[in-house]
């Protein structure tokens, strides 16, 4: 890469319950949400991973992963933006965490890190072949913690996840 696509977001512990947490000098706790991207020849990437270390965090992480998989399954030319959002949101709601999914399921990106369309329930329009979007559902429990998994997806008949980094990363704090 030539440089970062945006300022990296690192949030841990209860601060991870805010999707765009500001940096602090607080001691690192778990989970740790890291959102970063690279810029290459003017084009951006955008990825988020969450490092977890408890059964409760893993339970939430698994729900978010299931929601992301369902969203990615729907990504294809001609599919409504709102339908991609609904696929992720329905999974999270089925587990009783719907009120804690507080942002859109994704967004387009390219020369800028956030481009239209947003992939949300309010978005009108349909996916077009060769768009590049994120799939990034999350659950954010105020005062406790948050979990987000974000990958970049190329819209095709059989859409392709462009992110190659493992979703679940082992670590010791």
What do these predicted regions represent?
Residues 1-173:
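Active-site neighborhoods and metal-handling regions in enzymes and metal-associated proteins
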């Amino acid at each position: 890469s030539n440089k970062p696509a945006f300022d990296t977001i690192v949030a841990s512990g209860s601060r991870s319950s805010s999707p765009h947490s500001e940096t602090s000098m607080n001691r690192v706790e778990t989970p740790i949400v890291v959102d970063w991207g690279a810029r290459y020849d003017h084009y951006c990437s955008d990825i988020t991973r969450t490092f977890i270390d408890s059964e409760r965090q893993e339970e939430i992480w698994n729900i978010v992963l299931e929601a992301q998989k369902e969203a990615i399954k729907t990504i294809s030319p001609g599919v409504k933006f709102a339908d991609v959002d609904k696929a992720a949101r329905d999974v999270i709601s089925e587990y009783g965490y719907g009120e804690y999914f507080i942002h859109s399921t994704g967004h387009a990106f390219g020369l800028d890190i956030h481009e239209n369309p947003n992939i949300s329930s309010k978005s009108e329009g349909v996916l077009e072949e060769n768009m590049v979007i994120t799939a990034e559902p999350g659950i954010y429990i105020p005062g406790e913690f948050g979990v987000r998994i974000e990958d970049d997806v190329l819209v095709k008949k059989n859409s392709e996840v462009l992110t190659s980094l493992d979703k679940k990363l082992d670590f010791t704090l």
